[in-house]
């Protein structure tokens, strides 16, 4: 079954997907979008569902617990996280899905990839994501 490895990975990370947060559904949709647009936008080195699940999605969200722990030690009200050279949105989009309490800024210089990122933001209803078209060197603060 497609998605079985993704579900098992989420369980290992103790990430619960339910009808309210729809984590699995959003990650599944994102993987399908990567597969659909990969050849046009060169987003990953594979279009295999399970490979994307393990090597890209689960790898991206493996940092979620550490990010939460780091955020607790900071005295800021709002935590902002930048994904510089976001490409196809990895690790930013998977992290934004599992950490909706944080703001994510996806910085990408290529127009077509920015268009892909904006599309994913809309499709996945990621209100905590901002796409910035820029080179990393030109980003201030």
Give the ranges of each region predicted by the language model.
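Class I SAM-dependent transferase core
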Residues: 1-76, 119-129
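Conserved SAM/SAH cofactor-binding pocket of Class I
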Residues: 61-141
């Amino acid at each position: 079954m497609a998605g079985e490895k993704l579900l098992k990975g989420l369980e290992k990370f103790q990430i619960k997907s339910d009808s309210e947060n729809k984590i699995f559904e959003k990650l599944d949709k994102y993987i399908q979008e990567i597969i659909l647009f990969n050849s046009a936008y060169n987003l990953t080195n594979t279009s295999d569902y399970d490979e994307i699940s393990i090597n890209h999605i689960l790898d991206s969200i493996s940092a979620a617990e550490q990010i939460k722990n780091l955020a607790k030690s900071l005295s800021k009200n709002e935590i902002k996280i930048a994904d510089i050279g976001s490409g196809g949105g990895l690790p930013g989009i998977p992290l934004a899905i599992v950490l909706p309490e944080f703001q994510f800024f996806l910085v990408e210089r290529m127009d077509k990839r920015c268009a892909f990122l904006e599309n994913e933001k809309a499709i996945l209803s990621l209100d905590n994501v901002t796409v910035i078209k820029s080179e990393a060197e030109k980003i201030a603060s």
